[in-house]
Amino acid sequence: RCASAGEYFPLWNRREGLGNSVPGQVSSALYYPLRPIWFLPWLSLPQRYALFVVLHILVAATGIGFAARRLALNKTAAKFAMVSYALSCPVLFQQYNLIYLCSAAWIGFCFGSLSDLWRAQYHEQRLACGRSIVIFSLSISMMILCGDPHTAVNCGILAAAGILLLIFRGQTRIESRMRGLGFLLSAATLIALVTAVRWIPAWRWSQHSNRVESTVTPFL
């Protein structure tokens, strides 16, 4: 309705309660890069919906294929992983809850880049490390921008735990440990910059909540 009126980035939703900030809601996908699919003028709304779902299923399959190749699986295993993940019930069923379908589509790129990083760390390949940082950060950022920061946080926790385990194990050299910590810092910085348009409005809107200044303990 807003798009038909020429308002592609609505800032206020007056139909939710007494009014609500659209950018301030963490589940809104206002700045998600694939959102313009919903504005294609030559398609009907059901066709846009179908295109959006199919595109993300293809992205999910591609991401898992990327992860499978980084794990050195053969072509048959990689293709099986692509089909079994993209068409699995937990992923395919999210066509009815699109923000989770969007985040599921980027998980493969997230963990595939981590596998690439571990290999690059072992062989001290700086270019491969840099590529892994970019792919990992952008995949996490896409999860946040699509309105599912919870999955992004879960992936970030698993990634941080894996990297910390890698750099602080046994006889790891100081240089390798510093590179691992540098990866975490670089990834966090890049994610914060890419998603600033998302988390800054959410943080500012949260400051309007009475719970921010409340001294009452809940449920007591």
Please provide the spans of the model-predicted regions.
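Membrane-interface coil-to-helix junctions
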Residues: R1-A61, V83-G108, F219-L220
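Coil-to-alpha-helix initiation sites in intrinsically disordered, low-complexity, charged segments
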Residues: Q125-A128, R173-S176, P218-L220
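Alpha-helix initiation and N-capping motif
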Residues: R1, L30, L34, A77-F80, ...
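Membrane-interface helix-loop-helix junctions at transmembrane boundaries of multi-pass membrane enzymes
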Residues: G170-G182
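Aromatic-rich transmembrane-lumenal/periplasmic boundary elements in polytopic membrane proteins
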Residues: R1-E16, L190-L220
